């Protein structure tokens, strides 16, 4: 199938992938008086007395905002907020279908950090959570940080944390399959943007000790000249031996390669220099850092990508619907690192160790167990860490 051509045809037919639907009947005068004036005044007064009642008396308890500025849409780059709308609508559809979360797209005509933060923060009282999407680095880090400071509802940048959760889940199972422990392995990350940073932080939360991050100039380490603020922060928690050199240099002896960078950055020869039975997650889209067949030919034990036409697709839809479902169910004030770690374990544990195979380390996104497992794990840890309101 020509997905581009067929998708364009269907988008013209659909004229949007989401809609607002009334949940109550408005078929007579009594219905009208209850859903709207004069009866609606009473819930308004209740919320005036206690804003928390907005979760009980409105749809806020199940409503999320999906926010973009259109600056980093898929692999298309800075295409603008209006052009990002089809992706945001699609995201909202996935929220509903995979998490039963009502989501609304907000495409903002600004790239100014403070304008975006102020716009979203002013709207936060109408929503139970905020999902940031397709905002370019390093601004995405600052936007998320400032919104977390200003908002008392979860703020979640899916390009960072959703990717990190599913990558971590896949790695946990790949380590089981190859007989390794996370505290003993060496990981090399290609890509120092939003996703790469979040993946490393979550893996460290899960026990990883030895990890080297690379950008276009090679290994990142403390003291390397020209690092921006975010890369300097990553240098402080990675590459403790301050190993310098190219990606090829630091990949020697590594157990795991994770790529969120560019096509063709890893060769068969580089894979052959890694530890025995290496794990490779080349996730650049649509063309990965190395094609799976080449990685396997060079000795890889497990390969996962971001593509649905290869085994072991590392797909964010396994994470964000269940994470938000769990957070909303307990009226969470935040989605913290332990909650993300719990989501990763929940996804990984859906596959019994006896069922693991080289081509089956991560559940299918359509597995009906995913939402319940992830949401329950996230809600439990939200309560344990004090992030839950109820």
Language model region names:
Residues 12, 55-60, 65, 96-97, ...:
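Solvent-exposed alpha-helices and their adjacent loops that cap or buttress functional pockets
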Residues 105, 131-134, 155-158, 189, ...:
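General beta-strand structural signal in soluble alpha/beta enzymes
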Residues 74, 79-99, 157, 161, ...:
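Glycine-rich phosphate/diphosphate-binding loop of Rossmann-like nucleotide-binding domains
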Residues 232-301, 307-309:
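Rossmann-like adenosine-cofactor binding region
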Residues 158-159, 180, 282-390:
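Adenosine-phosphate binding glycine-rich loop
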Residues 150-164, 280-285:
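Short, acidic/small-residue loops that bind anionic groups at enzyme active sites
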Residues 1-155, 375, 381, 385-389:
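N-terminal ligand-binding/catalytic initiation module
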């Amino acid at each position: 199938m020509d997905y581009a051509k067929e998708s364009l045809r269907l988008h013209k037919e659909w004229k949007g992938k989401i809609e607002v639907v009334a949940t109550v009947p408005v078929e007579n005068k009594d219905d009208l008086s209850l859903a709207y004036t004069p009866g609606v005044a009473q819930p308004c007064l209740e919320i005036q007395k206690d804003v928390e009642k907005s979760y009980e008396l409105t749809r806020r308890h199940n409503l999320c905002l999906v926010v973009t500025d259109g600056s980093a849409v898929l692999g298309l780059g800075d295409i603008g907020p209006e052009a990002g709308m089809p992706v945001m609508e699609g995201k909202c559809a996935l929220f509903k279908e995979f998490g039963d979360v009502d989501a609304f797209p907000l495409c903002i005509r600004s790239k100014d950090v403070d304008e975006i933060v102020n716009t979203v923060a002013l709207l936060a009282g109408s929503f139970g959570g905020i999902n940031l999407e397709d905002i370019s680095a390093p601004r995405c880090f600052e936007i998320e940080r400032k919104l977390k400071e200003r908002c008392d509802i979860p703020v979640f940048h899916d390009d960072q944390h959703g990717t990190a959760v599913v990558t971590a889940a896949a790695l946990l199972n790949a380590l089981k399959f190859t007989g390794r422990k996370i505290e003993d392995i060496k990981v090399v990350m290609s890509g120092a943007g939003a996703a790469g940073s979040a993946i490393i932080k979550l893996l460290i939360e899960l026990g990883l000790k030895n990890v080297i991050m690379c950008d276009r100039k090679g290994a990142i380490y403390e003291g390397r000249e020209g690092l921006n603020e975010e890369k300097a922060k990553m240098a402080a928690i990675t590459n403790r031996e301050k190993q310098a050199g190219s990606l090829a240099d630091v990949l020697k002896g590594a157990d795991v390669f994770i790529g969120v960078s560019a096509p063709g950055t890893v060769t068969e020869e580089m894979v052959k220099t890694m530890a025995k039975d290496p794990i490779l997650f080349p996730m650049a889209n649509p063309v990965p850092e190395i094609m799976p067949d080449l990685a396997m030919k060079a000795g890889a034990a497990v390969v996962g990508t971001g593509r649905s036409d290869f085994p072991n697709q590392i797909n964010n839809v396994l994470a964000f619907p269940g994470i938000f479902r769990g957070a909303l169910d307990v009226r969470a004030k935040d989605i913290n690192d332990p909650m993300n770690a719990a989501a990763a374990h929940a996804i990984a544990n859906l596959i019994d160790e006896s069922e693991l195979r080289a081509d089956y380390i991560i559940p299918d996104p359509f597995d009906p167990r995913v939402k319940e497992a992830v949401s329950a794990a996230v809600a439990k840890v939200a309560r344990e860490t004090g992030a839950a309101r109820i």
